[in-house]
Amino acid sequence: MKIFLCLIAVVSLQGVLAYDIEREYAWKNISFEGIDPASYSVKNSIVTGFAHDADSKKIFITIPRLNPVPITLTELDTTKHPEGSPPLSKFPGSDKLISVYQPVIDECRRLWIVDAGQVEYKGDEQKIPKKNAAIIAYDLTKDNYPEIDRYEIPNNVAGNPLGFGGFAVDVTNPKEGCGKTFVYITNFEDNTLIVYDQEKKDSWKISHDSFKPEHESILTHNGAQHILKLGIFGITLGDLDEEGNRQAYYLGGSSTKLFRVNTKDLKKKAGQIEFTPLGDRGSHSEALALAYDPKTKVIFFIEYNSKRISCWNTQKSLNPDNIDVIYHSPDFIFGTDISMDSESKLWFFSNGHPPIENVQLTFDKPHFRLISMDTKKSIHGTKCEVKP
């Protein structure tokens, strides 16, 4: 997911008190439980993604490996640490991971990650040798989270794994079992979507014009403008239909448009695929990630340029008049991840530093903030609320 996600929100407590925030964590820097801070680089320990398991009350947090970041997949027990800036613990199920950008939890309480298989810096190839990118799943229902699935993505499918963006896990019939699962991974550099069929242990990639950057995005930071050019980045899944398929909603990192495709088409290794443009969210609404809430039928967007969380009810047409804002802060700089947990809680994260070269982090303010809100409360009184 390229290190620009690692170069990412000097976040303070200003400007957020008016929002109905249920939980908030804020770190000036990341520390690891049981590891001497002198043994690793604080400035390189940049969180990019997370997933909250509502059953265990644990948050799984990813830190792409830069030299010398000791752990790429960690966990946080929210029962022990309900707020503040707690240290992160090593995820017990991972010993040989190279570099992970984002975790996802599915309906079967499996934690999925995509290991890029390589790091983004030179000089330590002997210490951290390059491997094939891999899709890995862990069982959160068992002690120590045993690994239950691993698939190495062929190089001709993975392309440049440092271009992996978000991904979504599609369990086609969770009520009857978890064996039939697909994983959809975006690649914003190659402008492709990777499909993994867990049952058949096969994968393929799809290309389409809607995966390409729509334009050059202008990111304003400290009064200066910087250009980003990012292809398909965020993806989220809608409701299951009677045939076990869903609508997959996706967006480009340098686009204000939203598209959808039926997963029925994505699951076919060869064949015609119908991609549908849904509309435009409006100027300066570029986002890296989005999350669908099945209870409210609302999609939430984490907008990196406008420093806000916006919403759109999928039962309405998509245009700027039907977009609303549930959170905004001038200090919410370059949000990187957003997701729903199984209790319909919305979680979103900013890591404090935009993708700008030669910008030094300062550690007198929180750089990382993780916030949760109740979805129904957050959209109450907004355009995203559909009243009966």
UniProtKB/Swiss-Prot annotation:
Glycans are attached at N29. The keyword Ligase does not apply. Female salivary gland (at protein level). It is found in: Secreted. One of its GO terms (cellular component) is extracellular region. InterPro entries: 6-blade_b-propeller_TolB-like (IPR011042), Royal_jelly/protein_yellow (IPR017996). Keywords: Glycoprotein, Secreted, Signal. Residues 1-18 form the signal peptide. The keyword Transferase does not apply. Probably modulates blood feeding of sand flies on vertebrate species by binding and sequestering different mediators involved in the host response. Binds biogenic amines. Binds noradrenaline with medium affinity. Binds octopamine with low affinity. Poorly binds histamine, adrenaline and serotonin. Belongs to the major royal jelly protein family. This is Yellow-related salivary protein SP03. It comes from Phlebotomus perniciosus.
